Amino acid sequence: MKAYVTSIGEATTDLCVWSLQRNGFDVELIQDKTTLWDKLNRIYNKADHDFVRVDADVVPNKMLTPQAVNLAGANISWWLQFQTFDWHKQSLTWGGVQFIRKEALPYLRDSVDKFSDKIRPETELTRIPQFYSPRRFESVPDVMGLHGYKATDLKRVKELKAMRNQSPNYDWELEERLNAL
């Protein structure tokens, strides 16, 4: 199964790629300074089979295998979002690991351009009618990796979370103390 890793140069990019390869994925790294929307657009227009998309700031654990994602969720789900342990929050969080079945691709290709100017285009795509009527998007509570560890651009991360009004969910003080160890 193909795994697309999207990166802007995160410190954990190589580790993310290695872990996915170790777990049995054929990995394609998309690493540049373009937006997530641009990367998603390229992936959706290139993919022709089921795939996973993983943020490069996620270090996948041994749970994230082609077999595990194929067995997760309901049979009618076209898009599964998994959990990770978030280093910034020091808690579980959704996202960072997405499994998309080929049945979703026509709808993603048709809709991705509508969200080119959105801060979170992938989240917006989960809300299109084809994914909720009937329900085709599913959040699966399986923890598939560690998100945010060894972030070297903490200022950018904090600014992004503030822009999304998510800062209260994060434990920046604990993260900074852990990083100082």
Where does each model-flagged region fall?
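Short, acidic, metal-binding catalytic loop of nucleotide-sugar glycosyltransferases
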Residues: L15-V27
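A short, conserved alpha-helix in the catalytic core of glycosyltransferases
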Residues: F115-P141
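Acidic donor-binding/catalytic loop of UDP-sugar-dependent glycosyltransferases
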Residues: V58-L71
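C-terminal catalytic/acceptor-binding lobe
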Residues: Y132-L181
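Conserved nucleotide-sugar donor-binding
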Residues: G96-R109
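Short beta-strand-to-loop acidic/aromatic patch adjacent to the donor-nucleotide binding site
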Residues: H49-V59
